[in-house]
Amino acid sequence: MMSMVEIPEGKLIPAIAQDWKTGEVLMLAYINSIALSKTLETGVAHYWSRSRGKLWRKGESSGNEQIVKEILVDCDEDAILLKVEQKGGACHTGYRSCFYRTLDGRIVGKRIFDPDEVYKR
């Protein structure tokens, strides 16, 4: 798969992960040229960790991978949408989606795994 998006070296762009069947928004992360190349090469979502400053394969610690089905680019070519098959939860807090609570703090998602067990904190 070729990419029409060229991400300049050192630049990060937002990458939204969305369930390819339901349309549910799962998470927002950032991607650079290295992560995009690895995603295209493997078919598994890779992102750039801003906090760790390194490439990160989604699910490398938890097993909760994102199998990429389609990649869309926005009109300005400065954000991408990954349509994925989510294995397990997308959120490191144990929820299927990182968008599991309302602005006033009400929980609207369901926790599907215990992060303390998965990440052995």
From Swiss-Prot:
Tagged with keyword Kinase: no
Entry binding sites for Mg(2+): 74, 76, 78
Reported cofactor(s): Mg(2+); Zn(2+)
Substrates-to-products reaction catalysed: 1-(5-phospho-beta-D-ribosyl)-5'-AMP + H2O = 1-(5-phospho-beta-D-ribosyl)-5-[(5-phospho-beta-D-ribosylamino)methylideneamino]imidazole-4-carboxamide
Annotated residues for binding of Zn(2+): 75, 91, 98
GO molecular function, one term: magnesium ion binding
GO biological process, one term: L-histidine biosynthetic process
GO cellular-component term (any): cytoplasm
Cofactor binding remark: Binds 1 Mg(2+) ion per subunit. Binds 1 zinc ion per subunit.
UniProt EC number: 3.5.4.19
Record flagged with keyword Nuclease: no
Pathway membership: Amino-acid biosynthesis; L-histidine biosynthesis; L-histidine from 5-phospho-alpha-D-ribose 1-diphosphate: step 3/9
Cellular compartments annotated: Cytoplasm
Keyword annotations of the record: Amino-acid biosynthesis, Cytoplasm, Histidine biosynthesis, Hydrolase, Magnesium, Metal-binding, Zinc
Top-level lineage group: Archaea
Family (UniProt): Belongs to the PRA-CH family.
Assembly behavior: Homodimer.
Function summary: Catalyzes the hydrolysis of the adenine ring of phosphoribosyl-AMP.
Stated name of the protein: Phosphoribosyl-AMP cyclohydrolase
Organism: Methanothrix thermoacetophila (strain DSM 6194 / JCM 14653 / NBRC 101360 / PT) (Methanosaeta thermophila)
Record lineage: Archaea, Methanobacteriati, Methanobacteriota, Stenosarchaea group, Methanomicrobia
